[in-house]
Amino acid sequence: MNFKAIILAAGKGTRMKSKYPKVIHKVCGKEMVNHIIDVSKKSGVKDTVVILGHEADVVKEKLAEEIIIAMQTEQLGTGHAVKMAKEYINDEDTIVVLCGDTPLIKEETLKRLFEYHIENKYHATVLTTRVGNPTGYGRIIRDKKGDLLKIVEQKDANSEEKMISEINSGIYCFNGKSLREALDLLNNNNSQGEYYLTDTAKIMRDKGLKVGAFAGSTIEELMGVNSRVELSKAEEIMRRRINESHMVNGVTIIDTNSTYIESDVMIGNDTIIYPGVMLQGKTRIGSDCIIGMNSSITNSEIGDGTEIKNSTIIDSKVGENSTVGPYAYLRPKSDLGNNVKIGDFVEVKNAIIEDGSKASHLSYIGDAHVGKNVNIGCGVVFVNYDGKNKFKSIVKDNAFIGSNSNLVAPVVVEEKGYIATGSTITHDVPDGALAIARERQVIKEGWVEKKNQKDDQSK
């Protein structure tokens, strides 16, 4: 069975009050249209066609290369939109039509829709739900056997039909051959002058084909996002789902209301997440980690047993059983090994720091390779920029960099090299050598008294 998705994403979304197309607004770090694409793939869809219109190039930039694009230059209704993808619909396909602004649809729901459609040998199946207040929605009218008779829009419903609580979700499953034939018979003979996809069900039924409705979803899951208020609601629901999913899988989240975890983040079991944490992008957190209050980690990998304390980590890697923070900043391309300590107010950028090394306080380590078991004292600066170019420094295994020292790149400190406190190092340091690069202390006895006398005389 070849499942293919057609995603309707051509609309402008004027109620969003945005210069950007509606479907690329993000929910928990991912564009709405990409949520739909990912969920459809997980449900078994092999190929995806996205119908674009308004600001098509902007949307296309956010889509993976394998996504098929079909254009709807004029927005003439949902049926017209699907017509634009007709060349990609094969007779043997099972087609699911989805809306690009419904990011909360679940993989399990689509799988059940497919199963229901196939088991009942329907040519078209609409996904439905029942609500307490159906006002504004298209009503599902079933025949005596429970099959779909028709879909009646709110404005066309009579008083009896308005009492029906089962509503149309806007998500459909079709037999490919039947859909192609029905699209050819669509017309726009209605008050809006549009081609409605819902009319395909009636066309199929009039031809004697079996069509159905699957009441297998919830109004929350089917919520469309048309405004910033609805975007916020979708974000809240998605965030709750994500947090609950991690907790079910063995992660402790102290305060779910203040914890923000994006949809592609992965976390190992027995990790504890404290309040105020933000985990974004493709971040991977290992098992038995502690992610402390107000830490922000983006597109980074954290090894098992590591503790992050109130720190910011971006596009970096931290090994196992290491500690970072409090108030540390790992900028892009920081790569820390196992059992590494990066302490308070230490900044690391584009640097490798190997196993067992530590920089406990107030240091800047940029464009560097630090070996194993190196001690970097308080106030050490890797001076990497001459105003035009950046250079790299290398500190090899078991070296000791004394407090308040400057390593002026490019410079190499060989194994067991020892830098005296307060030194400014501009030349390589040999293996096992002590480097002292500072003025010798001078004591001038009685200097203060002489200075005071001179100051008094000048008054």
UniProtKB/Swiss-Prot annotation:
Here the disulfide bonds are: none
Required cofactors, per record?
Mg(2+)
Kindly state what the record says about how the cofactor is bound: Binds 1 Mg(2+) ion per subunit.
Q: Where is the active site?
A: 361 (proton acceptor)
The entry's acetyl-CoA-binding residues are 384-385, 403, 421, 438
GO MF, one example: glucosamine-1-phosphate N-acetyltransferase activity
Q: Where does Mg(2+) bind?
A: 101, 226
Which reaction is recorded as catalysed by this protein? alpha-D-glucosamine 1-phosphate + acetyl-CoA = N-acetyl-alpha-D-glucosamine 1-phosphate + CoA + H(+); N-acetyl-alpha-D-glucosamine 1-phosphate + UTP + H(+) = UDP-N-acetyl-alpha-D-glucosamine + diphosphate
Q: Where in the cell is it found?
A: Cytoplasm
Could you say which residues bind UDP-N-acetyl-alpha-D-glucosamine here? 8-11, 22, 72, 77-78, 138, 153, 168, 226, 331, 349, 364, 375
Q: How does it assemble?
A: Homotrimer.
Q: Which family does it belong to?
A: In the N-terminal section; belongs to the N-acetylglucosamine-1-phosphate uridyltransferase family. In the C-terminal section; belongs to the transferase hexapeptide repeat family.
Q: What does this protein do?
A: Catalyzes the last two sequential reactions in the de novo biosynthetic pathway for UDP-N-acetylglucosamine (UDP-GlcNAc). The C-terminal domain catalyzes the transfer of acetyl group from acetyl coenzyme A to glucosamine-1-phosphate (GlcN-1-P) to produce N-acetylglucosamine-1-phosphate (GlcNAc-1-P), which is converted into UDP-GlcNAc by the transfer of uridine 5-monophosphate (from uridine 5-triphosphate), a reaction catalyzed by the N-terminal domain.
Q: Which PANTHER family match?
A: BIFUNCTIONAL PROTEIN GLMU, NUCLEOTIDYL TRANSFERASE
Its name, as the record gives it, is Bifunctional protein GlmU
Organism this protein belongs to: Clostridioides difficile (strain 630) (Peptoclostridium difficile)
